[in-house]
Swiss-Prot record:
It is a single-pass membrane protein. Keywords: Glycoprotein, Host endoplasmic reticulum, Host membrane, Host-virus interaction, Inhibition of host innate immune response by virus, Membrane, Transmembrane, Transmembrane helix, Viral immunoevasion, Virion. This is Minor capsid protein p17. GO terms for cellular component: host cell endoplasmic reticulum membrane; membrane; virion membrane.
């Protein structure tokens, strides 16, 4: 890239490189001058990240527990109907059972008794 054609771009690039080098130099100088302090600060930073991850995991588990303690749908939703050749997903089976096999579906009272026993 020619500096005569785009002096602004080359100036911007050189300024950016200078800032980058001075920042790296300052960081290296600080680490060399205060190795103990730098190690302590890095250790604290790593511990904070670990604590943050643990808090996030605990919070996520509590959120999952709250979802599991929410009111559940009636037990008839989970009961498996006895079918000899069952190869369909639940929604197909529900539709078929609602018309042809009403006698096999227990009432809510019977299901509540089964759940409590």
């Amino acid at each position: 890239m020619d500096t005569e054609t785009s002096p602004l771009l080359s100036h911007n690039l050189s300024t950016r490189e200078g800032i980058k080098q001075s920042t790296q130099g300052l960081l290296a100088h600080t680490i060399a001058k205060y190795p103990g302090t730098t190690a302590i600060l890095l250790g604290i930073l790593i511990l904070l990240v670990i604590i943050l991850i643990i808090v996030a995991i605990v919070y996520y588990n509590r959120a999952v527990d709250c979802k599991s303690s929410m009111p559940k749908p009636p037990p008839s939703y989970y009961v498996q109907q006895p079918e000899p050749h069952h190869h369909f997903p639940v929604f197909f089976r529900k539709r078929k059972n609602s018309t042809s096999q009403q006698s096999h579906i227990p009432s809510d009272e019977q299901l509540a008794e089964l759940a409590h026993s």
